[in-house]
């Protein structure tokens, strides 16, 4: 019972610390990471909007291949 209480208190304390730290650092990040879709388009060859694509290959820069013919959206 004591161990359970200690674990609960520890989790609550760590959660509170995370929330306080996250609130204090909001908007202070200098070098933000690129979004994953931007990284994908910069690191691999991908097809632009309107190009033919394969729904199984995920080869569109936008990430979406739609339609019956398969065009990048």
Curated annotation (Swiss-Prot):
Disulfide bonds join 46-61, 53-65, 60-72. The record marks 58 as: Important for calcium channel binding. Residues 23-45 form a propeptide. It is found in: Secreted. It comes from the Eukaryota. PROSITE patterns: OMEGA_CONOTOXIN (PS60004). GO terms for molecular function: calcium channel regulator activity; ion channel inhibitor activity; toxin activity. Keywords: Amidation, Calcium channel impairing toxin, Disulfide bond, Ion channel impairing toxin, Knottin, Neurotoxin, Pharmaceutical, Presynaptic neurotoxin, Secreted, Signal, Toxin, Voltage-gated calcium channel impairing toxin. Coiled coil: none annotated. Expressed by the venom duct. The modification Cysteine amide is found at residue 72. Changing residue 58 to F: No activity on neurotransmitter release. One of its GO terms (cellular component) is extracellular region. Its main location: secreted. Residues 1-22 form the signal peptide. Belongs to the conotoxin O1 superfamily. Omega-conotoxins act at presynaptic membranes, they bind and block voltage-gated calcium channels. This toxin inhibits neurotransmitter release, it blocks N-type calcium channels, probably a N-type (Cav2.2/CACNA1B) calcium channel variant. The presence of a 'disulfide through disulfide knot' structurally defines this protein as a knottin. The cysteine framework is VI/VII (C-C-CC-C-C). This is Omega-conotoxin CVID. It comes from Conus catus (Cat cone).
